[in-house]
Amino acid sequence: TPVVNPPFLQQT
């Protein structure tokens, strides 16, 4: 399963 990045790492 792919790991989802935490909100503070969601640099879009």
From Swiss-Prot:
A single GO cellular-component term on record: extracellular region
Compartments (UniProt record): Secreted
Keywords noted in UniProt: Antibiotic, Antimicrobial, Bacteriocin, Secreted
Keyword Cell inner membrane: no
Organism: Latilactobacillus curvatus (Lactobacillus curvatus)
GO BP annotation list: defense response to bacterium; killing of cells of another organism
Record-given protein name: Bioactive peptide 1
Entry coiled-coil feature ranges: none
Function noted in UniProt: Has antibacterial activity against the Gram-positive bacteria L.monocytogenes, L.lactis subsp lactis and L.curvatus H28, but not against the Gram-positive bacteria L.curvatus CWBI-B28, L.brevis and L.plantarum or the Gram-negative bacteria E.coli and Pseudomonas sp 55. Has no antifungal activity against S.cerevisiae, Penicillium sp BKS-TAN2 or A.niger.
